[in-house]
Design a protein with these regions (language model features):
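A short hydrophobic beta-strand segment most commonly corresponding to one strand
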Residues: 69, 97, 111-127
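Short acidic-glycine-tyrosine-enriched beta hairpin
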Residues: 84-100
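A short, N-terminal "cap"/entry segment at the start of jelly-roll beta-barrel domains
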Residues: 1-45, 128-135
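Short, conserved beta-strand element in jelly-roll/cupin
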Residues: 50-53, 64-79
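Short beta-strand His + acidic residue motifs that chelate non-heme Fe in jelly-roll/DSBH
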Residues: 59-61, 79-80, 98, 103-110
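Conserved short histidine dyad/triad with adjacent acidic residue
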Residues: 32, 47-64
Length: 135
């Protein structure tokens, strides 16, 4: 369900996760999948993703053009600042905001961590990670 319209103006965006799974908004990579619920064409100023990371995955990431906030809803892991070696545990109820474009490593330690992620500026939906782990 893409949203409600009045004379061509979007008045409310309603989207179910089940509509995103398996669609062009569902991106997958080695050890992760991102169900991209809100994207740039929704004109909300950020994108909103329901992301799953497979237990045992170690993702090397660096978003040079985006800021990211992550809220953990299931599983456990940790985020490592590659430059400083600082480590922060991630578990349900913990938010981690990557506000300096830092190189990071995300490790999925227990279960498949589920994260609600917001990116600004918003992603268009067709991005894939480059060699540096960014978009």
């Amino acid at each position: 369900m893409p949203g409600n319209f009045i004379e061509g103006v979007k008045t409310l965006i309603v989207r179910e996760l089940s509509d995103v799974i398996g669609s062009w908004r569902h991106a997958k990579g080695d050890g992760w999948e991102s169900r991209r619920i809100v994207l740039a064409d929704d004109q909300m100023g950020c994108s909103l993703h329901d992301t799953l990371v497979k237990e045992g995955a170690e993702l090397h990431l660096e978003y040079k053009d985006h800021l990211e906030s992550n809220y953990c809803i299931e599983g456990e892991g940790e985020v490592v600042n590659v430059a400083t070696g600082e480590v922060w545990p991630i578990r349900p109820g913990v938010m981690c905001a990557l506000n300096k474009h830092d190189r990071q490593m995300l490790r999925a330690l227990k279960g498949d961590p589920g994260l609600i992620c917001a990116f600004t500026p918003a992603l268009s939906g067709n991005e894939t990670h480059d060699a540096d782990g960014g978009y």
